[in-house]
């Protein structure tokens, strides 16, 4: 008798994606982050749903409702901190996942890569709007500063900002719409994840060697299900250590002060996972230039497949490109540090140099390294 999972219309789809999926036999732990991201998204939707049951998106009660969740709701504090720190874990996994794609040349699967970039933007937008919801000082001023950047758009800028605000400043209308979008975007992200997987399973996964693995595939279950479960357990362990021992480690103390439009915090900065982009934005003195650099810092990923000059797919056997890749990682860490520093000497100069280096590595050095490595192969 044929197994039901292979004939049932719905089970058949799940079976071909998670059970009988032919998978390269040599994929390393770097390939775990896809499933970890799925776990993070599920966790965020679940904890977010419970928070939404108690949250009120009104400027007068938003801050109090978050306090109420932490003090009065059964296990509300753990749900709130799992949601807040879950976002940090989400972004750690996201950046690892993108980094893996860059290192091993997974961007050659262009449809999967491009859907991934759209997903990245969706999740970044969700996280930004979520940061506004507690209506603390950093929520309010972060929303004001970031939405104000749209005023740099020529001709329609001011109208665009006021349209997004729903008034002449960040106020009740802004908070309500941000809550609505923050609620719906993760579900849109879930749909995009399905499309991401659809395109991935059309071609099959890449692997560390970068060569075709068609001749050596193994079923996803049990080999990679058990590996993914181990990864998920480690993720949950890390998250719970963070939640239980230092839940506010990655947050901003200013967000425990209720939003006050009349008092500007000394240093307005976003959550740590946006600091690298914020540093790039701040490193350009011109407003429009800064906004474009901010967008390009992520959009640059879309042209990476066009800049691939090497005859080899991944960087596993390309030492020059490897050095450049880790230089890029160090540069991004430097930008993250600079984004959290005040705008004064020497941080301004370091930020500008790090921003120039970021674009130069991706646009100039890496393609040149690929050509050099091709020539070395001829010797």
From Swiss-Prot:
Keywords: Electron transport, Heme, Iron, Membrane, Metal-binding, Mitochondrion, Mitochondrion inner membrane, Respiratory chain, Transmembrane, Transmembrane helix, Transport, Ubiquinone. GO terms for cellular component: mitochondrial inner membrane; respiratory chain complex III. Binds 2 heme b groups non-covalently. The chain crosses the membrane at residues 33-53, 77-98, 113-133, 178-198, 226-246, 288-308, 320-340, 347-367. Gene3D superfamilies: Cytochrome Bc1 Complex, Chain C (1.20.810.10). It holds the Pfam family Cytochrom_B_C. Heme b b566 binds at residues 97, 196. It comes from the Eukaryota. GO terms for biological process: mitochondrial electron transport, ubiquinol to cytochrome c. It is found in: Mitochondrion inner membrane. The keyword Metal-binding applies. InterPro entries: Cyt_b/b6_C, Cyt_b/b6_C_sf, Cyt_b/b6_N, Cytb/b6-like_sf, Cytochrome_b, Cytochrome_b_C_euk/bac, Cytochrome_b_N_euk/bac, Di-haem_cyt_TM. The keyword Mitochondrion applies. Signal peptide: none annotated. PANTHER family: CYTOCHROME B. Component of the ubiquinol-cytochrome c reductase complex (complex III or cytochrome b-c1 complex) that is part of the mitochondrial respiratory chain. The b-c1 complex mediates electron transfer from ubiquinol to cytochrome c. Contributes to the generation of a proton gradient across the mitochondrial membrane that is then used for ATP synthesis. This is Cytochrome b. It comes from Zalophus californianus.
């Amino acid at each position: 008798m044929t197994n039901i999972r292979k004939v049932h219309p719905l089970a058949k789809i799940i079976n071909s994606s998670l059970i009988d999926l032919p998978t390269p036999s040599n994929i390393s732990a770097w390939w775990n982050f896809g499933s970890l991201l799925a776990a993070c998204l599920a966790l965020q939707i679940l904890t977010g749903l419970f928070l939404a049951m108690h949250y009120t998106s009104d400027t007068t009660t938003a801050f109090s409702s978050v306090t109420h969740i932490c003090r009065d709701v059964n296990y509300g504090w753990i749900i709130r901190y799992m949601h807040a720190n879950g976002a940090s874990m989400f972004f750690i996994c996201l950046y690892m996942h993108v980094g893996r794609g860059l290192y091993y040349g997974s961007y050659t699967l262009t449809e999967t890569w491009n859907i991934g970039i759209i997903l990245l933007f969706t999740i970044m937008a969700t996280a930004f709007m979520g940061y506004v919801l507690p209506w603390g000082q950093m929520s309010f001023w972060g929303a004001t500063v970031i939405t104000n950047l749209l005023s740099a758009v020529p001709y329609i800028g001011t109208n665009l900002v006021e349209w997004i605000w729903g008034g002449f400043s960040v106020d009740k209308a802004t908070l309500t719409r941000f809550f609505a979008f923050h609620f719906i975007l993760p579900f849109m992200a879930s749909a995009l994840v399905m499309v991401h997987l659809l395109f991935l399973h059309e071609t099959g996964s890449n692997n560390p060697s970068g060569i075709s693995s068609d001749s050596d595939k193994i079923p996803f279950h049990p080999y990679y299900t058990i590996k993914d479960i181990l990864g998920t357990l480690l993720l949950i362990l890390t998250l719970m250590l963070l939640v239980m021992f230092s839940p506010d480690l990655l947050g901003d103390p200013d967000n425990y002060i209720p939003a006050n439009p009349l008092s500007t915090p000394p240093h307005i900065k976003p959550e740590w996972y946006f600091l690298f982009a914020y540093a790039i934005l701040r490193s350009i003195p011109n407003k429009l230039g800064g906004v474009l650099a901010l967008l390009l810092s992520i959009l640059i990923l879309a042209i990476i497949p066009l800049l691939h000059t090497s005859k080899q797919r991944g960087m596993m056997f390309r030492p020059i490109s490897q050095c450049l890749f880790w230089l890029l990682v160090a540069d991004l860490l430097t930008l993250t540090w600079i984004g959290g520093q005040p705008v004064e000497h020497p941080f301004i100069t370091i930020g500008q140099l790090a921003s120039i280096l970021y674009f130069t590595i991706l646009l100039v050095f890496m393609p040149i390294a690929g050509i050099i490595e091709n020539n070395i192969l001829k010797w």
